[in-house]
Amino acid sequence: MIKLMDLLRIAGIYLNSYKIHCATGKEDPPLEAFFECRFKAWQEYQNQQNFRCDEIISLIHLQEDKWLFAGIYQVLGVKHRKEENKSWYEYGTKEMAGLDHLTGRIVVQFRKRFLAAYRGSVAATPPGEPRE
């Protein structure tokens, strides 16, 4: 079985500071948002400042330990929003190009062993390339 990070490297994608977003939800399910072409906007609305990273690897829960690869998004910025008794964070993101052949087509086997919906990491830069 091939690992997702290996598949991304084959596609020429090398990530620096990233978080894995394990998208779940019942009120407005992320899978519905994905198939209705509004997942990017769905993901950009957060109750906390969850995406303190350069890139987001988005996975949408399907069942048990199966997750749909929903793309990689570059984090462009964040704005804290307030309205009456409500507060949230609105992210600006840009979907990484060149992954159309994988997005929505790859099912990742991943056993989530943590409570938060986000898992952070810093990936190695490819040999011979400077880190930004």
Regions found by a protein language model. Name each.
Residues 51-54, 68-70:
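Short connector loops at helix/strand junctions that flank enzyme active sites
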Residues 1-53, 130-132:
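Compositionally biased, charged N-terminal/linker segments
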Residues 54-64:
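Short conserved beta-strand and strand-loop elements enriched in small hydrophobics
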Residues 1-11, 19-23, 65-70, 78-132:
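Contiguous surface segments at macromolecular interaction interfaces
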